[in-house]
Curated annotation (Swiss-Prot):
Keywords: ATP-binding, Cytoplasm, Kinase, Magnesium, Metal-binding, Nucleotide metabolism, Nucleotide-binding, Phosphoprotein, Transferase. It holds the Pfam family NDK. Signal peptide: none annotated. It comes from Brucella anthropi (strain ATCC 49188 / DSM 6882 / CCUG 24695 / JCM 21032 / LMG 3331 / NBRC 15819 / NCTC 12168 / Alc 37) (Ochrobactrum anthropi). Major role in the synthesis of nucleoside triphosphates other than ATP. The ATP gamma phosphate is transferred to the NDP beta phosphate via a ping-pong mechanism, using a phosphorylated active-site intermediate. This is Nucleoside diphosphate kinase. It catalyses: a 2'-deoxyribonucleoside 5'-diphosphate + ATP = a 2'-deoxyribonucleoside 5'-triphosphate + ADP; a ribonucleoside 5'-diphosphate + ATP = a ribonucleoside 5'-triphosphate + ADP. The gene is ndk. ATP binds at K11, F59, R87, T93, R104, N114. Its EC number is 2.7.4.6.
Length: 140
């Protein structure tokens, strides 16, 4: 098994409900270690930059408005197969389809307000980590 890093974000719907600790506890219980973390309130421009891959999708405006509507927690997680493990712990994007015990099944309000974001591949993990963190902010 490979030790890798992934990007994780706790979204505004979850921070508003004080779920940061509960979500982080689920990630840590799955064997993921937080090696960088900060609380940020994205500007609309930052949200548009972070989600630029979706700029031509019909939900882009709603997504970026939501992501800039309150604080988020951006994190770098480390562990064996961290990308796949994080996605497993998060659950399906649509909470109605998420497995019991996953973050989205337990905490998400809707498909849009689904509490967390996580990288889907090593390349996106590297890009998303670099968007929010400098190398000196990541302490393993």
């Amino acid at each position: 098994m490979a030790i890798e890093r992934t990007f994780s974000m706790i979204k505004p719907d979850a921070t508003r409900r004080n779920l940061t600790g509960a979500i982080t506890a689920k990630l840590e219980a799955a064997g993921l270690r937080v090696v960088a973390s900060k609380r940020v309130w994205m500007s609309l421009r930052e949200a548009e930059g972070f989600y630029a891959v979706h700029k031509d999708r019909p939900f882009f405006g709603e997504l970026t408005e939501f992501m800039s509507s309150g604080p988020t927690i951006v994190q770098v997680l480390e562990g064996e197969n961290a990308i796949a493990k994080n996605r497993e712990v998060m659950g399906a994007t649509n909470p109605a389809n998420a497995d019991e015990g996953t973050i989205r099944k337990e905490f998400a309000l809707s498909i849009g307000e689904n509490s967390v974001h996580g990288s889907d591949a090593p390349e996106t993990a590297a890009e998303e980590i670099a968007y929010w963190f400098s190398g000196t902010e990541i302490v393993g």
